[in-house]
A protein has these predicted regions:
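P-loop NTPase motor domains
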Residues: 1-177
């Protein structure tokens, strides 16, 4: 599927990080490169036959970047923060699809995190949610009512709207058709 193209995922994630932390184009490009390098290291390329391989975790991207000879700039600071907060796992056995995860009620308590970390987590969850919904066909309709597959609630969503996260805007405008 086209949505599995590494550059699509890398762009989504880099965009979320950049917007959450208020980064510019140069920093966005650096993050994008780090993600694409991790995909290449995992043997995942533009060739769709490689897309069944385990994708690199975001923690792997962060660790790999910080292990390198990098200048201590804004991207370094962001990745250090992500490493310190231990938001991501490096164990692919702990990773599930968004739909598997949402088979029951999930609550993510972000009260202890700094605002930019909260924004990043919400944005990444919504990115994955939207990408997986997009891969499904539209939900069934019966007697004028559309099937409700999943519900996602973002408390204080107005704080995220001003960040112009692409996935939140797309979910608001297109989400109904996916159920």
């Amino acid at each position: 599927k086209f949505m599995n193209l590494p550059s699509i995922t890398a762009n989504r994630v880099a965009d979320s990080i950049s917007k959450a932390f208020g980064l510019g184009n140069v920093q966005n490009s650096t993050i994008l490169e780090a993600i694409l390098d991790a995909y290449a290291e995992a043997g995942i390329t533009r060739d769709s036959s490689t897309w069944t391989r385990p994708a690199p975790t975001m923690q792997r991207v962060v660790d790999k970047y910080l292990e390198g000879d990098v200048k201590k700039d804004t991207v370094y600071s962001v990745f250090r923060m992500l490493q310190d907060y231990q938001i991501f796992t490096n164990d692919t056995n702990n990773c599930v699809t968004m739909f598997e995860w949402l088979k029951s009620v999930q609550v993510i308590d972000l009260t202890l995190y700094e605002d930019n970390i909260k924004k990043l987590i919400v944005s990444l969850v919504l990115d994955v949610f939207y990408a997986e919904m997009k891969q499904l066909k539209g939900s069934d309709q019966k007697d004028g009512f559309r099937e409700l597959r999943t519900m996602i609630l973002v408390d204080e969503a107005h704080q995220f709207m001003k960040m112009k996260f692409n996935s939140l805007r797309k979910i608001i405008s297109e989400g109904r058709m996916f159920g």
